[in-house]
Amino acid sequence: MPIHIGSSIPLMVEKMLTEMVKPSKHIPQQTLNLSTLDNDPYNEVIYKACYVFKAKNVADDDNRPEALLREALSDLLGYYYPLSGSLKRQESDRKLQLSCGGDGGGVPFTVATANVELSSLKNLENIDSDTALNFLPVLHVDIDGYRPFALQVTKFECGGFILGMAMSHAMCDGYGEGHIMCALTDLAGGKKKPMVTPIWERERLVGKPEDDQPPFVPGDDTAASPYLPTDDWVTEKITIRADSIRRLKEATLKEYDFSNETITTFEVIGAYLWKSRVKALNLDRDGVTVLGLSVGIRNVVDPPLPDGYYGNAYIDMYVPLTAREVEEFTISDIVKLIKEAKRNAHDKDYLQEELANTEKIIKMNLTIKGKKDGLFCLTDWRNIGIFGSMDFGWDEPVNIVPVVPSETARTVNMFMRPSRLESDMVGGVQIVVTLPRIAMVKFKEEMEALE
């Protein structure tokens, strides 16, 4: 169905071709096991992102980014060959296995055209997820096995294009995805090999469950909101300028002397978001709300994981408080709790306990039960795809737009870099937020107060 977006011309996207791109060199047939963190059922979701590239500044008769990217993908799979395989969760132990190599396999690569210019879509700034899906490859988790990676190139009338990526989170985290996408554009730009050599080594993050310890499942039966359940959800991208972040940090330091510790944007804005979300949802004040944080553990592993390790290398830390406490605590109080959670994540013994706990969750097929109204997770996407230049002839992407599963988006706030076209937003952040429509009104009031 045509979609009208910022133009009198309805948007129509025609997907012309999908082919299976295979590695440029022969890969022996093999079966690979994944780490405990990769096997976490909460990681078996498909994350997608749109990389928006403007047209070249000069006319070019050979304006075919899809040809360069298709060849680069084949070369990439010679290094990242597991991406060309197939994932399947085994019934026997509920672990994922990756089958790759041989004559089968490949990565779905789609070429599409759009009948409008990128400017009519404002380079996807504040685009809704349903529209963004037009520029993304189709990829789903399937109990019978599925491809973990797919790409789509959508060309626009202006000469610009969108590189759409879909990836199973079981294969990699944001760090790994960033390296993969930069390696792809490096190869498309003429480099002979990726700057960082990929390494599998998933056995380095495998836990050993202790039978006498019951598993901990986060976020069970949290505080209730009068606005949930609902089918009326909205997603907004909230802009927070550098001056607002600076003022909030200064106010936080006046509340509490953090001595030689640096307080980060993620910490102070995360604390402010939690307080704002609790108010917006009008959570039961005596009920528990849980803040979830993704904390990297690459350097906690002994020895540290090499740069080329692209599997999941983070653990989720949880800070539980009653809704009343979140409202009454100062920003500095919450920042202290966030810092404590991050310190715990960097403890080697804690990491082993977390791996053992996750192994039990997998084995027992446990999921979060009860209300999730008070569950609130933060994730930082500011460095997704930013591990080097992505310029392979069309300059750097002017915008990177994540598209996450709707069920996940309802409990997660994503930190994003502002669009490169917004010069007045240098040093600021954008927060992608999904809330019930009635709660979003109050949430935006709280965020406007920050400005």
Curated annotation (Swiss-Prot):
Record key words, sorted: Acyltransferase, Polyamine biosynthesis, Transferase
Keyword Lyase belongs to the record: no
Residues that bind spermidine: 47, 169, 294, 316, 378
Activity-pH behavior: Optimum pH is 9 using spermidine and sinapoyl-CoA as substrates.
Tissue: Predominantly expressed in siliques, especially in seeds around the embryo, and, at low levels, in flowers. Barely detectable in stems, leaves, and roots.
GO BP terms: polyamine biosynthetic process; spermidine metabolic process
InterPro entries per the UniProt record, alphabetical: CAT-like_dom_sf, Plant_acyltransferase
Biological pathway: Amine and polyamine metabolism; spermidine metabolism
Pfam families linked: Transferase (PF02458)
Residues at the catalytic site: 169 (proton acceptor), 391 (proton acceptor)
GO molecular function: sinapoyl spermidine:sinapoyl CoA N-acyltransferase activity; spermidine:sinapoyl CoA N-acyltransferase activity
Catalysed reactions, semicolon-separated: 2 (E)-sinapoyl-CoA + spermidine = N(1),N(8)-bis[(E)-sinapoyl]-spermidine + 2 CoA + 2 H(+)
Similarity section: Belongs to the plant acyltransferase family.
Protein name: Spermidine sinapoyl-CoA acyltransferase
Species of origin: Arabidopsis thaliana (Mouse-ear cress)
Name of the gene encoding the protein in the UniProt record: SDT
